[in-house]
């Protein structure tokens, strides 16, 4: 069990400083932070299971939260704890208020010194995004880390609820999670009998990449009545080339690009005039933050995707 109160392991911190992992200014900042927390430790009774299957417990609701990925930032705000966020990372652009919060680096490299000076009492880490060594260093400083990375619809709702538990904002967080579940269930019911549409969803351009059916985006394609042409591949995010897409000849090509208005990835396919998706003008843009971030806004992104597939059905 991990505890969030400022329950500190001083020996671990001193070891980090002495072996160089927390040297220099970071070491000084870390030691100052630790000394400020050397109060009698007690196990907390506010607990939640994270996505690494560890139970994280706090002695009191989190008041100073650091969210170390754009998705984590959105989820904390969705949980009703946006007013507690004291640190984010690059590209944490939603909600707009998050852009005013102090940045502590990016998803792949955290500025630990700056993070420590902000004195978070809870850090939200991204399972496959943040460097594990840095998250372990944060924990060794006595700062609890809650690992998240939703991989399905229920995982998104559950993440919001668990974060709300840790922040003491259950009323708002549970409401958001419930609305998300209900909205996704309504979409699933509406498109349950829809005629299948073959879909290529592009998540990257160089190298060309898609998703399989286990990926959250693949699940959304299926919910909308789409058939993912690469759904049965073993890799979650397979690398491809133009030739395999041409051979599969999807009825729809959907992509998000690198930004909300970047549609360049779709124009690339227009050179292949024999593609069914090109012949029928079924090249669709979906704002990436609405479907490529596992947050409650996925409901809006899925609705857009479903509407695009319905347009494709009407063009047969």
Regions found by a protein language model. Give the residues of each.
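N-terminal secretory signal peptides that target proteins for export/translocation
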Residues: 1-22
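Cleavable N-terminal signal peptides
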Residues: 30-32, 42
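Extracytoplasmic substrate-binding proteins
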Residues: 45-48, 54-55, 121-122, 126, ...
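Short helix-initiation/N-cap motifs at beta->coil->alpha
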Residues: 51-53, 104-113, 129, 233-242
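A short, structured surface patch at a secondary-structure boundary
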Residues: 63-118, 122-128, 229
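His/Asp/Glu-enriched short active-site or ligand-binding loop at hydrolase and phosphoryl-transfer sites
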Residues: 89, 214-237, 257, 284-285
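Short helices/loops that flank or line small-molecule/ion binding pockets
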Residues: 112-119, 141, 240-249
């Amino acid at each position: 069990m991990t505890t969030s109160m400022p329950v500190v392991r001083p020996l671990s911190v001193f070891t980090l400083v002495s072996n160089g992992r927390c040297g220099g200014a970071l070491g000084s900042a870390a030691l100052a932070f630790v000394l400020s927390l050397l109060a009698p430790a007690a196990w907390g009774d506010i607990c939640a299971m994270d996505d690494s299957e560890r139970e994280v417990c706090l002695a009191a609701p989190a008041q100073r939260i650091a969210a170390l990925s754009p998705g984590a930032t959105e989820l904390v705000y969705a949980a009703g704890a946006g007013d507690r966020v004291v640190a984010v990372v690059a590209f944490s652009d939603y909600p707009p208020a998050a852009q005013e919060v102090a940045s502590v680096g990016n998803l792949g490299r955290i500025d630990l010194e700056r993070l420590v000076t902000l004195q978070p009492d809870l850090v939200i880490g991204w399972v496959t995004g943040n460097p594990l060594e840095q998250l372990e260093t944060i924990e060794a400083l006595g700062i609890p880390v809650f690992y998240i990375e939703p991989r399905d619809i229920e995982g998104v709702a559950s993440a919001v609820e668990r974060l709300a538990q840790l922040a003491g904002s259950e009323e708002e967080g549970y409401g958001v999670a419930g609305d998300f579940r209900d909205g996704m269930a309504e979409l699933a019911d509406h498109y349950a009998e829809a005629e299948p549409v073959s879909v290529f969803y592009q998540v990257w351009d160089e190298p060309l990449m898609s998703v399989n059916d286990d990926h959250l985006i693949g699940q959304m394609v299926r919910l909308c009545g789409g058939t993912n042409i690469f759904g049965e591949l073993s890799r979650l995010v397979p690398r491809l080339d133009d030739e395999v897409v041409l051979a599969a000849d999807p009825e729809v090509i959907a992509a998000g690009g690198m930004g909300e208005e970047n549609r360049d990835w779709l124009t690339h396919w227009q050179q292949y005039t024999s593609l069914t998706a090109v012949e029928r003008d079924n090249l669709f843009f979906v704002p990436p933050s609405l479907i490529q971030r596992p947050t409650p806004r996925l409901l809006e992104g899925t609705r857009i995707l479903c509407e695009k597939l319905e347009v494709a059905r009407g063009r047969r």
